[in-house]
Amino acid sequence: MNVNKFKSMKGKKPIVMLTAYDSVFASIVHQAGVDAILVGDSLANNVLGYSDTLPATMEDMIRHTQAVRRGAPEAFIIADMPFLSYQCSSDEAVRNAGRFLKEAGANAVKLEGGSFFSTTIERIVKSGIPVMGHLGLTPQSVNVFGGYKVQGKGDKSAKYLLEEAKALEEAGVFSIVLEMVVEETAKMITENLSIPTIGIGSGRFCDGQILVINDLLGMNPSFLPKFAKRYSNLFQISLEAVKNYVSDVQNHRFPFEENVFKAGE
């Protein structure tokens, strides 16, 4: 997979993406046949224990992107640019975006926001770094939105999102994530762009879909977004496995005969 092949899939075959944050899950996700892996800044609230994405740092993202690359050497990997890694200046944005390719082995970066960042995106792309855009609910701006709210509900909001999407396309992004955009608006945007849209909570008519791996696997039993589907219950499976281990040790059932070394072997 590369940027050109990714773009060519628009309207032909649904694009499948998932997040991954470490080498083990990167290997699983890649072997399962996803088209691209996103090392999301959702690392912060899915792995590092924070309540939202804002605390993720460049060093966090670089380190985990490196791990994902080690786990999936042949995968198409997109790395999220964390909060304040590109907002302060275009120079800093280019420098930080370049680190993901040079140090971490990413193929592209993703950044949130619309036309306000067009100049920054243009500079990053002209520096040889592919950029994926992100519109709709942009979690790094959750304090501006006043919460995690569905976007694009009215005609005015839908028109605004389309204009922003076209601005990103003109700036040079190769694809756009649409997050928590009402299905009708996401469909309209998808039909009016020449680049693929990747939906997360944005209905059935985007060019592709992405989910957070933790949601898909059921790793957080107390939370599941409306737009996600839980394909497993890994938290409960893991909990039962650890409970069985605790019980075996406490009741002298582990180690088993086959787990011990003996003299003369």
UniProtKB/Swiss-Prot annotation:
Reactions performed catalytically: 3-methyl-2-oxobutanoate + (6R)-5,10-methylene-5,6,7,8-tetrahydrofolate + H2O = 2-dehydropantoate + (6S)-5,6,7,8-tetrahydrofolate
Source organism (scientific name): Pseudothermotoga lettingae (strain ATCC BAA-301 / DSM 14385 / NBRC 107922 / TMO) (Thermotoga lettingae)
Functional note: Catalyzes the reversible reaction in which hydroxymethyl group from 5,10-methylenetetrahydrofolate is transferred onto alpha-ketoisovalerate to form ketopantoate.
Keyword hit for DNA-binding: no
Top-level EC class: transferase
Main location: cytoplasm
Subcellular location, record wording: Cytoplasm
Amino acids binding Mg(2+): D41, D80, E112
Official protein name in the record: 3-methyl-2-oxobutanoate hydroxymethyltransferase
Pfam families found in the cross-reference section: Pantoate_transf (PF02548)
SUPFAM superfamilies on file: Phosphoenolpyruvate/pyruvate domain
